[in-house]
Amino acid sequence: MEAASRLTRRQSLLLPLILTVSVVSALELSSRLMTYVLEEFGEAAHQRLENWQRLHALAANAPTDRQLRLVNSFFNRVTFVSDIRHWGQEDYWATPVELLTTNGGDCEDFSIAKYLTLRAMGVPDDQLRIIYVKALELNQAHMVLAWYETPGSDPLILDNLINDIKPASQRNDLEPVYSFNGEGLWLNRTSGDNA
């Protein structure tokens, strides 16, 4: 667990840079990639990627609350699979294309995919944070995406464990540890605060 924790911390320090670079091309999938996915992974995987692109096209100009609901619902249809079972590794952070192509991923994969999709739709980076939390009922590490209407507001939590988007103040099952986005990394100020 100590090694996995160190790896996660290391990844989280690099992620803001990766997220900033990745958001630009998050939904621009080449015809070559789409052909490869169709040939190697089949029609269902190809269709999931097309649906992702369609979601972006349809929701890019929608109000933010609708974008949040559509993106959360879209990715929550993907099957939860642990990294060990899915990738044969203790901790693997999949790209949205990998998540959708294989139709499986864990909480980090869901959070990253939601973040990148919302950024590609124009949601400002300063309104989004990926939050590393402790899921108290499961007694394990977990990751969610938060949307802040304003910097000091109670964020809305997009989570693959539940389909409803709720304010952090109503998520007593989550204890935040740290959060990050393309701009930086923040440590939780006081233990016991909700995401």
Per-range role (PLM):
Residues E2-A4, V23-A195:
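A structural boundary/capping signal
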Residues E2-I18:
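N-terminal secretory signal peptides and thylakoid transit peptides that target proteins
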